[in-house]
Amino acid sequence: MAAEKVREIEVPQGVTVTVSGATLTTKGQKGQISREFRFPGISVRTDGGKVIVETGKDDKQTKATVGTYASHIKNMMTGVSEGYEYHMKIVYAHFPIQVKVEGKDKVTIGNFLGERKARTANIVGETKVTVQGDKVVLTGINKEDLGQTAANIEQACRIRKRDPRVFQDGIYITSKA
């Protein structure tokens, strides 16, 4: 697919988009997200019910960045209107893993492979984490924060110096919505 110099994104009903300098803010029923879009030669503006990302340059990197910005803006609009949800599953063979949410910024994973010390994973941004039996549900409006939080939880359960074909314990992403 050839990269385009101009991308137009329709603003869904119930979402308002404002551009102030290089900062784009989306507001919807689930909340508000602001993000700075600063790249030489690329401008982001609103026109009626559309957000327009455009460039005057012809080089590959600039055109690719136009597409990247368009995707980020679509994700922001989807997040404030519908939200995102990741489902993770707690998997263990012998030692039952105990997962607890501490405050708004940490998840503790206890008794992982029988370890005495609990492992921790950081919660990024405004992501909400709930534990329901052997399932962990992450919800939020920022797709990047949600994905980073899920990655932090998966990486906290990474098994080192053992055969991964035998030791398959951990917390894994099962679905994204």
Swiss-Prot record:
Query: What lineage does UniProt assign to this protein's organism?
Result: Archaea, Methanobacteriati, Methanobacteriota, Stenosarchaea group, Methanomicrobia
Q: How does it assemble?
A: Part of the 50S ribosomal subunit.
Any one cellular-component term (Gene Ontology): cytosolic large ribosomal subunit
Keyword Ribonucleoprotein on entry: yes
Give the record's GO biological process terms: cytoplasmic translation
What the entry lists under InterPro entries is as follows: Ribosomal_uL6-like, Ribosomal_uL6-like_a/b-dom_sf, Ribosomal_uL6_a/b-dom, Ribosomal_uL6_arc, Ribosomal_uL6_CS2
User: Quick check: keyword NADP in the entry?
Assistant: no
Annotated PROSITE patterns = RIBOSOMAL_L6_2
Q: Tell me the name of the encoding gene.
A: rpl6
| SUPFAM superfamilies in the cross-refs | Ribosomal protein L6
Q: Which NCBIfam families match?
A: PRK05518.1, uL6_arch
Described purpose of this protein according to its UniProt entry: This protein binds to the 23S rRNA, and is important in its secondary structure. It is located near the subunit interface in the base of the L7/L12 stalk, and near the tRNA binding site of the peptidyltransferase center.
Per its record, how is this protein called by name? Large ribosomal subunit protein uL6
Ordered alphabetically, the record's keywords are: Ribonucleoprotein, Ribosomal protein, RNA-binding, rRNA-binding
Q: Which organism is it from?
A: Methanocella arvoryzae (strain DSM 22066 / NBRC 105507 / MRE50)
Q: Which domain of life is it from?
A: Archaea
Question: Which molecular function terms from Gene Ontology are attached?
Answer: rRNA binding; structural constituent of ribosome
- Which family, according to UniProt? Belongs to the universal ribosomal protein uL6 family.
